[in-house]
Amino acid sequence: MRRGTSIALIALGIASLLSGSSQAAVTVLGNGLARTCFLAAEFGGGSAEEGVKACSDALEQMALPVRDRAATLVNRGILYSRLDEPQMAIADYDKGIAMEPSLGEAYVDRGASLIVLSRYDEAVQDIDKGIAMGSNRLQIAYYDRGIAQEALGNVRAAYEDYKKATEIDPEFTLASSELARFRVVRRHSDGT
């Protein structure tokens, strides 16, 4: 399979990942619109449009603590990703990170949106930061970084990331499918 075709298929995989509920939402405690926004981002209940509205209403109508406001922006970003609006998603991730730079999930989620936009170097940097911060869904982070690494031509790094994702979550079929495409060839000590 040609590299361009492979990257296109990977982009479809990322798009399907973003359309599901596998991005890492940031928890908002209590009741109200911000909590509704979190539940829509985390569990995908209802339509993404309804979730975006709940998030927007929470941001406009509620006096949220800084962390909850940042989390609500990140959660709305996830919902924008599901609506195939990566630029809108990135704008919300940027605002959330500016308010609360310690949200590791925000970096991983922004990295996923950057992959959709073919901004692979930036995606790797963001995902690296999210991993270093201890993102709650490391298997997603490693999978996403593997996609970006493969798109950059860093095949060995991609393999290692897909492998790490399956070590963290052996049931993670997207990573297992990517890993299955690889063939490991051992080299002799003389380089052949």
Functional labels for PLM-detected ranges:
Residues D57-E60, L64, K95-A98, K129-M133, ...:
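Conserved structural position within tetratricopeptide repeats
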Residues R69, L103, R137-L138, F172:
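Residue-level recognition of tetratricopeptide repeat
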Residues R82, V116, A151, E178-H188:
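Register position in tetratricopeptide repeats
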